[in-house]
């Protein structure tokens, strides 16, 4: 089991980029932290989510 944004998710073995795409995240407007380390955008398709990972996806919102 994996914890993503505080929720238990069965995503072990899934490539991070695929998870983000499948769940509607816009890669241009998010930052991803995996096990307390930032994952750079160029690595999203190289990282496989592993059992026990803790992932936070943060979206940037503009406004004025």
Model-derived features with residue positions:
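Ubiquitin-like/PB1-type beta-grasp interaction modules and other compact soluble beta-rich domains
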Residues: 1-63
């Amino acid at each position: 089991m994996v914890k993503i944004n505080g929720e238990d998710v069965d995503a072990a073995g899934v490539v991070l980029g695929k998870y983000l795409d499948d769940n509607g995240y816009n890669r241009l407007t998010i930052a991803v932290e995996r096990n307390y380390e930032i994952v750079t955008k160029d690595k999203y398709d190289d990282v496989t989510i592993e059992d026990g990972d803790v992932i936070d996806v943060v979206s940037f919102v503009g406004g004025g």
